[in-house]
Amino acid sequence: MKNSIFKGGLLVVIISFMTACNQKKEVPAVMVDKEAIKTEIQAMENAFAESYNNGTTDAINYYAEDAVSFSNGKMPLEGKKAIHESMKTELLTFPKGAKIAFETQEIHPSNDGNMLVEIGGYKVTDSTGTKVNSGHFISLFEKKDGKYICIRDMGNSDMPMTKK
């Protein structure tokens, strides 16, 4: 009888040790600094606008090689090269002296900070500072090699449609 009690007690002790050793430790959550990310994304938008306004679209280091961009009245543009070619075409009809500016209004990073949705607006002003176009955009970024790069974006004008 004593032997059975001893074996039962030993079994309880072994099971207790096994369950205690198998408890999962809580992994601390990655802290994502939204303000720092928003500042980083706004700096990318500012660099994009500066290159666009200077007519140097090849200097725009914003899109991934396999990015897809969606715009009003166009088929989706697939790939960085197609997006840059479209920008070059747009610049041919971009008003002389006009400037585009982008504003990051919201960011929504993933819990680990490796993916990010940006919601923003844009405004085009002529040489006198008068607004000639404006709209909104949404962009999806992925972090590659420590830097965000746009993999998808979509934009639309909020100006009234002109009749053809």
Please state what every model-predicted region is.
Residues 67-78, 91-97:
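A short gly/proline-enriched turn/hairpin at secondary-structure junctions
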Residues 21-62, 162-164:
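Short, low-complexity N-terminal intrinsically disordered segments enriched in polar/charged residues
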Residues 88-127:
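Surface-exposed, charged secondary-structure patches
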Residues 25-26, 134-161:
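Short beta-strand edge/turn micro-motifs at domain boundaries
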Residues 129-131:
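Solvent-exposed, non-transmembrane alpha-helical starts
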Residues 63, 110-112, 144:
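Structural motif
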